[in-house]
């Protein structure tokens, strides 16, 4: 695992989607701790476009809507939480459940159970017939130490520059080198206080004749910021961005000097939009996840959120193989399911990045033009003129372009400025600027093939996903195979606690490879449940049955005990309908109560029947589990 001294700003996450917060609800209160620790939503719900942080506002976009705060489609809402803070919380929770975090080397011993090594870098991988021998390097007290770690599986979740990916020769496909940027991590409580009371927001797009940049407000209360600025090598070099130079640029963007500014770190980085050509190598024993498998523009928080989705999909499949529940053939379904999502999110993040460029383009600063000018200089005079002259030429052209942002031009009394400001307003009104939330892609993404029984259309073809829109679409709950199980509050029918209300998502085990069968309390569904439990038991598969009682019609005495005997792994629940949504569970799922839903350990629907199983139920369920787990 990489060093705990994680660079805090390069590609730091600024938004945790609801799907991710739902996952974290199962990790011993992690979601609740994030909700408590994040800044108040009023401090981060807006993106602000301005001429300087203390100057005039060109416009702002509020990215939170009323439905983002209710619990109709999700038991939790989105969160604003930096990646390095999340890493610290994850380590804290791992230690709380018995894991040991170590920074020193192994000293020729084996890696112990529940032991995590920090500060170790993978330097080589050597597959053998039985294991993968991984060589790691670390530095302890100034000494360079190598360790040999044999492992059955190696998951390369080692970032965008993945060593594991490079060692096994997996190529990335997509759009490379979209933009080169400098990221400046700095602190200023003075600026934080001002923005907190005068212009609270998450992102600030700043355009003025002196400088252009995007400021990420990670924590206004603490005064922690990340400034992102494009740069154009070789005329502009990273070495030019010294601490003093960055301070001067920050002051131009703020509108005045800051007395307490502290530049913590300055890093260059390159924006890409790429997905690995494959996710598995070496007989499916080396697996890529997270940024190692895909690199997105940092527009919309797709990188970290997609990476956590990868881990959530992979974890139960690896556990199923290790526990002997499923054969190795289930592992390719990880790539079958996750890679199409990464490709979709790549397209969506590119569209969102292009939307981010719409405002500067409307103001007369089309980034495509800047890139073209830079390319012309490189391809024509680059080999003739001295580097200092090239730099002066490029800086002069860019300064001339930024002059269009002067108060003389950019005002309502200037016909050109008025026209440009009107274009910007239309962009905001039509929702065509950079978006923060994508509810349909957050909760509504669906696996089309893999560890599931897919549904086909009336012509016998698999149902295809809608193309990315680049704009906010609302999430519509679905019980289609491959979809995430819809959320609904339910009351657990228990003789001990009669008022325990949970989400349907809480019915799935958080620490076992266990499937969930949801049925209504009717005879045909009980018979189906008997068969499912019997077939699962024959294959060492855990299944819990959830009997969904309709709201207001539950017979408290007519429990499932006698109907499912001798099986005991079941739970009776009753719908808890919201005042703003009176739909029944089966209405939400667009099914009749005679249907049934089989849910995987990662909360995704593996199989469903809309009304009743036709034919031999035992044969059908054997086919279902074979399709899901790859059983022979």
Describe the role of every protein-language-model region.
Residues 9-96, 100, 107, 207-208, ...:
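Active-site-adjacent segment of FAD-dependent monooxygenases/related oxidoreductases
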Residues 90, 156, 263, 270-351, ...:
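Conserved mid-domain beta->alpha element of the FAD-binding
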Residues 103-132:
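A conserved short coil-to-beta-strand element within the FAD-binding core of flavoproteins
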Residues 610-632:
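Thiol-/selenol-based redox modules, centered on thioredoxin-like
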Residues 270-294, 480-512, 564-589:
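FAD-binding beta-loop-beta segment adjacent to the flavin cofactor pocket
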Residues 518-524, 549-550, 610:
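Structural motif
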Residues 319-476, 509-514, 530-538, 630:
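C-terminal helical "tail/cap" subdomain of flavin- and related membrane-associated enzymes
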């Amino acid at each position: 695992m990489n060093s705990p001294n994680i660079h805090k700003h390069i590609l730091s996450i600024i938004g945790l989607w609801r799907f991710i917060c739902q996952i974290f609800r199962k990790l011993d209160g992690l979601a609740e701790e994030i909700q408590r620790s994040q800044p108040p939503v009023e401090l981060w719900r807006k993106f602000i476009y301005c001429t300087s942080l203390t100057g005039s506002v060109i416009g702002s976009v509020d990215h939170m809507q009323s439905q983002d705060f209710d619990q109709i489609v999700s038991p939790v809402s989105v969160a604003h939480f930096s990646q390095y803070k999340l890493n610290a919380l994850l380590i804290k929770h791992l230690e709380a459940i018995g894991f040991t975090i170590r920074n020193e080397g192994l000293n020729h011993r084996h890696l112990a159970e529940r032991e995590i090594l920090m500060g170790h870098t993978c330097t080589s991988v050597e597959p053998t017939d039985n294991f993968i021998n991984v060589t790691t390097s670390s530095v302890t007290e100034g000494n360079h130490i190598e360790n040999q770690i044999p492992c059955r599986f190696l998951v390369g979740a080692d970032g965008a520059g993945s060593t594991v990916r490079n060692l096994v020769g997996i190529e990335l496909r997509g759009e490379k080198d979209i933009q080169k940027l400098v990221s400046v991590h700095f602190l200023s409580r003075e600026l934080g206080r001002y923005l907190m009371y005068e212009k609270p927001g998450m992102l600030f797009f700043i355009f003025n004749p002196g400088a252009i940049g995007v400021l990420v407000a990670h924590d206004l209360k603490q005064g922690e910021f990340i400034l992102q600025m494009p740069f154009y090598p070789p005329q502009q070099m990273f070495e030019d961005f010294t601490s003093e130079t960055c301070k001067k640029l920050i002051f131009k963007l703020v509108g005045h000097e800051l007395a307490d500014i502290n530049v913590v770190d300055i890093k260059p980085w390159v924006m890409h939009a790429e997905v690995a050509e494959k996710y598995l190598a070496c007989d499916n024993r080396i697996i890529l996840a997270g940024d190692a498998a895909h690199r997105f523009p940092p527009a919309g928080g797709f990188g970290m959120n997609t990476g956590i989705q990868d881990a959530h999909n992979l974890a139960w499949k690896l556990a199923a193989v290790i526990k002997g529940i499923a054969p190795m053939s289930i592992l390719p379904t990880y790539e079958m399911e996750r890679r199409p999502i990464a490709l979709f999110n790549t397209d969506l993040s590119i569209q969102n990045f292009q939307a981010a460029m719409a405002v500067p383009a409307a103001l007369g600063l089309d980034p495509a033009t800047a890139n073209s000018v830079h390319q012309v200089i490189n391809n024509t005079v680059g080999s003739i003129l001295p580097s200092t002259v090239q730099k002066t030429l490029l800086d002069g052209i860019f300064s001339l372009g930024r002059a269009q942002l002067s108060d003389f031009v950019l005002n309502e009394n200037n016909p050109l400025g008025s026209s440009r400001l009107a274009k910007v307003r239309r962009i905001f009104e039509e929702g065509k600027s950079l978006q923060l939330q994508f509810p349909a892609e957050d909760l509504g993404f669906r696996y089309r093939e893999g560890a599931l029984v897919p549904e086909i259309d009336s012509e016998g073809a698999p149902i295809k996903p809608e193309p990315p829109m680049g704009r906010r679409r609302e999430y519509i709950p679905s019980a289609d195979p491959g979809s995430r199980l819809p959320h609904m509050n339910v009351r657990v029918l228990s003789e001990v606690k009669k008022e325990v209300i949970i989400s349907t998502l809480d019915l799935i085990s958080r620490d076992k490879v266990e499937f969930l069968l949801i049925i209504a309390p009717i005879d045909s569904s009980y018979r189906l449940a008997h068969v499912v439990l019997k077939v699962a038991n024959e294959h060492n598969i855990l299944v819990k049955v959830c009997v969904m009682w309709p709201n207001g019609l539950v017979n408290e005495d007519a429990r499932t005990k006698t109907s499912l005997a001798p099986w005991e792994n079941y739970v009776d629940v009753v719908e808890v309908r919201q005042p703003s949504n009176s739909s029944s569970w089966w209405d939400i799922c667009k099914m009749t109560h005679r249907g049934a839903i089989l849910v995987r350990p990662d909360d995704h629907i593996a199989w469903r029947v809309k009304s009743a199983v036709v034919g031999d139920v035992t044969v059908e369920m054997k086919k279902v589990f074979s399709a899901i787990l790859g059983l022979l």
